[in-house]
Swiss-Prot record:
Domain-related comment: The WSXWS motif appears to be necessary for proper protein folding and thereby efficient intracellular transport and cell-surface receptor binding.
Protein name (database record): Cytokine receptor-like factor 1
Oligomeric and partner information: Forms covalent di- and tetramers. Forms a heteromeric complex with cardiotrophin-like cytokine CLCF1/CLC; the CRLF1-CLCF1 complex is a ligand for the ciliary neurotrophic factor receptor/CNTFR. The CRLF1-CLCF1 heterodimer, as well as tripartite signaling complex formed by CRLF1, CLCF1 and CNTFR bind SORL1 (via N-terminal ectodomain); within this complex, the interaction is mediated predominantly by the CRLF1 moiety.
Gene label: Crlf1
Main location as per UniProt: secreted
Ig-like C2-type domain span: 35-134
Keywords in alphabetical order: Disulfide bond, Glycoprotein, Immunoglobulin domain, Phosphoprotein, Receptor, Repeat, Secreted, Signal
Length: 425
């Protein structure tokens, strides 16, 4: 027999399943009672009633008939589990009024409300039923993480125990209290950002740490997570930056300008902020992230492809609220904003060649260094002012160097070469 699979289920698979329509609909929720009318005039009782067992356990159950009708016997009775008739070799008559059942190596319940174990009369009518709960006790929840949106609330989520599935209805309660005083509180808004999460909407204190933990309970036991201690100011996140605008930078074919505003919900609070930008081309799903935006609210993306549509998003990390030393939590990304770079006016492969201007060398150390600098710049997107100041300084130095070379060669501003004068006389 395969490990972990119950004997009766494995054997009953050889028989065609009994239609669920033959059972009362309350059985689907494992709510059983005495049949009302029908051909089953006798009633019975199953013992034990509604047992709770660990996976791999065995069950010894009995169905005992009682009633006032003469001739009532256990002969012809049979069992079903979740609508499937169990093999007759799993049952035996104890006496004229009692049918016993032996199940071994039970698997986890197929529904958290319990499996349906039913005793039937010869004609198929229901005599008695029991809910069978088979599962595992909960394990200690872990990995609790919490965040506060704009310091107005607190949302937490966690991971259930190592195995996760207990096969039984398991209740998770998030508890919290002020660290040094106050009573335990229970979160009430569950499943807000997933199956294991809870939302505390209001009445939170600032500048005072909270203790937060999760308790898990089911029919087989309980478990409690480690305590998480946090200050709301240390876990603040905010809405994505609004009013993100992306535009061209004049006629520069490889650059786009991105501008946005600070989170309005935090405008009255003392905090720093850092931003991230990510962008992708229109026909790609791969994003490139720019990390060095610092606390600016504008950025120039460089090294882009000419004549290409780009989608851009921005997110914010409002760290350092009221002097908090924590790293902060990133917001969601803003809605994508699109813009295109200008088309290149330079000839492509096979086209004309751009000739150097008169007096400009077509090669040399300076031009090679500039080519290397621009090639490096095209591979990166920079948003810090320092990068563009360096680029502007590079251009100014190049212009000054070019002017110096022209003067050394005797080229006048008008482009005419000056005539060399000899000594007077």
């Amino acid at each position: 027999m395969p490990a972990g699979r119950p004997g009766p289920v494995a054997q009953s698979a050889r028989r065609p399943p009994r239609p669920l329509s033959s059972l009362w609909s309350p059985l689907l929720l494992c709510v059983l009672g005495v049949p009302r009318g029908g051909s089953g005039a006798h009633t019975a009782v199953i013992s034990p009633q509604d047992p709770t067992l660990l996976i791999g356990s065995s069950l010894q159950a009995t169905c005992s008939i009682h009633g006032d009708t003469p001739g009532a016997t256990a002969e012809g009775l049979y069992w079903t589990l979740n609508g499937r008739r169990l093999p007759s070799e799993l049952s035996r008559l104890l006496n004229t009024s009692t049918l016993a059942l032996a199940l071994a190596n039970l698997n986890g319940s197929r529904q958290q409300s319990g499996d349906n174990l039913v005793c039937h009369a010869r004609d198929g009518s229901i005599l008695a039923g029991s809910c069978l709960y088979v599962g595992l006790p909960p394990e200690k929840p872990f990995n609790i993480s919490c965040w506060s949106r704009n310091m107005k609330d607190l949302t937490c989520r966690w991971t259930p125990g190592a195995h996760g599935e207990t096969f039984l209805h398991t209740n998770y309660s998030l508890k919290y209290k002020l660290r040094w005083y106050g009573q335990d509180n229970t979160c009430e808004e569950y499943h807000t950002v997933g199956p294991h999460s809870c939302h505390i909407p209001k009445d939170l204190a600032l500048f005072t740490p909270y203790e937060i933990w999760v308790e898990a309970t089911n029919r087989l036991g309980s478990a409690r997570s480690d305590v998480l201690t946090l200050d709301v100011l240390d876990v603040v996140t905010t809405d994505p930056p609004p009013d993100v605008h992306v535009s061209r930078v004049g006629g520069l074919e490889d650059q786009l300008s991105v501008r946005w505003v600070s989170p309005p919900a935090l405008k009255d609070f003392l905090f720093q902020a850092k931003y991230q930008i990510r962008y992708r081309v229109e026909d790609s799903v791969d994003w490139k992230v720019v990390d060095d935006v610092s606390n600016q609210t504008s950025c120039r993306l460089a090294g882009l492809k000419p004549g290409t549509v780009y989608f851009v998003q921005v997110r914010c990390n409002p760290f350092g609220i009221y002097g908090s030393k924590k790293a902060g939590i990133w917001s969601e990304w803003s809605h994508p904003t699109a813009a295109s770079t200008p088309r290149s006016e330079r000839p492509g492969p096979g086209g004309g060649v751009c000739e150097p201007r008169g007096g400009e060398p077509s090669s040399g150390p300076v031009r090679r260094e500039l080519k290397q600098f621009l090639g490096w710049l095209k591979k990166h997107a920079y948003c810090s002012n320092l990068s563009f100041r360096l680029y502007d300084q590079w251009r100014a130095w190049m212009q000054k160097s070019h002017k110096t070379r022209n003067q050394d060669e005797g080229i006048l501003p008008s482009g005419r070469r000056g005539a060399a004068r000899g000594p007077a006389g």
